[in-house]
Amino acid sequence: SGNRFELLLDGPQFFPRMLAAIAGAQRQVELELYLLTAGDCATQLVERLCQAALRGVQVRCLLDGFGSLGLPSVQRAQLLGAGVQLRLYNPLGWRRGLRNLYRDHRKLLLVDGELAFVGGTGATDDFWQPQDNSHAWHEVMVAISGPLVADWQQLFERQWPASLARLAWRPQPHNGLPRLPASPRQGDGLGRVAYADGRQHRDILHS
């Protein structure tokens, strides 16, 4: 309980909010993203991350090794040069065979351990074109504040070191999650983070 949720519809609504949150970060920023390709949207994101790192904020970016192939090497170098800690999840390798199919599809932005943005977006011009604040693809993100942010932070902290071994962290299986009451009071939202992957989804099915 004690959480606040705000549904943000489409890139023109959620990307400016996400960039503003990065710009206002005081201590730390964590970004976990699948799709990141060259364009104005990615440029805006990279610039905000670099600016945060240059003013002393700890910035960690975990990008999927396949989904981020479209990010130019010059922008990767820009991130590293500014002091951003950059890791790739499961970079492609010809010896890895079917293990190349293991991808990190999480889309998560955490700011100062107090604010989370989670949803389905990628950082491409299809989701947001900054020049005219337009979009081609429909997508949603949810802005979250409150105790639930700590659960998202925990997922990132688990996946961050696991990425070095090209592994996905998995919690212990459970027998299902308690059902949540409908329509909590505004500003007193109830929520739960349920982790799942292709082989571990029983908690969500039983919640």
Briefly describe each language-model feature range.
Residues 1-207:
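Charged, low-complexity intrinsically disordered terminal segments
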